[in-house]
Amino acid sequence: MFALADINSFYASCEKVFRPDLRNEPVIVLSNNDGCVIARSPEAKALGIRMGQPWFQVRQMRLEKKIHVFSSNYALYHSMSQRVMAVLESLSPAVEPYSIDEMFIDLRGINHCISPEFFGHQLREQVKSWTGLTMGVGIAPTKTLAKSAQWATKQWPQFSGVVALTAENRNRILKLLGLQPVGEVWGVGHRLTEKLNALGINTALQLAQANTAFIRKNFSVILERTVRELNGESCISLEEAPPAKQQIVCSRSFGERITDKDAMHQAVVQYAERAAEKLRGERQYCRQVTTFVRTSPFAVKEPCYSNAAVEKLPLPTQDSRDIIAAACRALNHVWREGYRYMKAGVMLADFTPSGIAQPGLFDEIQPRKNSEKLMKTLDELNQSGKGKVWFAGRGTAPEWQMKREMLSQCYTTKWRDIPLARLG
């Protein structure tokens, strides 16, 4: 048996946890550079605010409907996600983080001691008690059915946030699959939905009843696996350890357009520095660094430009100095004057778990001495707060930094932002 825990309106809910005054109030969270709506509380949804709706369209409504608006506070959201994970791991045999607000839980053996539905309510109540966040729990014999059950928690409020699909309630499974649009099935995207609809497959139940040989021949083994999972045959196991990454990308849209190469250099240094930190967190070494830049594709009155350059490294490295230097060399290849750049990024690839490589006899570049010790010290200094120690090339207060004009406090990651309670 599997359970899927999904935090309701996660970003908006995190903003409410430390603000009791926002209870039952409409809350929305904006994307990078405060561009569009990416999270809505139930109260905000009731006002008709759409996902992806541009901020400028909501700005006037904010005053009329007293909507509380926040910029994305990723440090807070990551911290709260880790708290939820810790609670679930304390109560469950194994947990797989699927996304920042979704976790698969292994329920093997639990049904011999307690009913899955009752255990789901226990999980829900404990997470609410220890983190202040409300979640829905879908329980089923396969991960795909657990996803469908979790979808049902939002459609069937009478189940109080927990829907269990077990062999004992076969009719519930059939009813749910008959109601669920095929496009809502886990792994079925928009294009696949159109193809299935053309064949008369409009619901999850119709997909479950499809011939597996036909699905495999005309679509893929992956969709065949989905059909089997909808019929209760477990084909996708729990992954407690995430698979090793094949690449790391650090990229942001700028708060202000960049026209100066020095400013772009600062941005690339910062992105390369962050990418190197992530690389060390993965315990990997890279042999390829790519820098890319681009203007806005929507600025019709401005010339468009987009380009990328790749730098191959002679030795595998996780040293920020090597990665920053390579990223800046690549920038020199792609930089063109006369453009208003809106985005840049650095991508690391060609990973290896070891930095050991045999240099050529006449190679001028040799491995840096004490590189691992220096990088470990750097990471430890920055562990309690990003940006305590950084490379000078990224500048001190760049104007191009991402706009977050309505950022909430980092209640769980900064000492100065810890909430205070006054008695009396």
From Swiss-Prot:
GO molecular function: damaged DNA binding; DNA-directed DNA polymerase activity
Domain annotation UmuC: ranges: 2-189
GO cellular component, one term: cytosol
Domain of life the protein comes from: Bacteria
InterPro entries: DNA/RNA_pol_sf, DNA_pol_Y-fam_lit_finger_sf, DNA_pol_Y-fam_little_finger, DNA_polymerase-Y, DUF4113, Rev_trsase/Diguanyl_cyclase, UmuC
CDD domains assigned to the protein according to its UniProt record, in alphabetical order: PolY_Pol_V_umuC (cd01700)
Record's keyword terms, sorted: DNA damage, DNA repair, Plasmid, SOS mutagenesis, SOS response
Biological process annotations from GO: error-prone translesion synthesis; SOS response
Function: Involved in UV protection and mutation.
Annotated PANTHER family: DNA REPAIR POLYMERASE UMUC / TRANSFERASE FAMILY MEMBER (PTHR11076), PROTEIN UMUC (PTHR11076:SF34)
Classification via NCBIfam families: PRK03609.1 (NF002955)
Entry similarity comment: Belongs to the DNA polymerase type-Y family.
Protein name: Protein ImpB
Gene behind this protein: impB
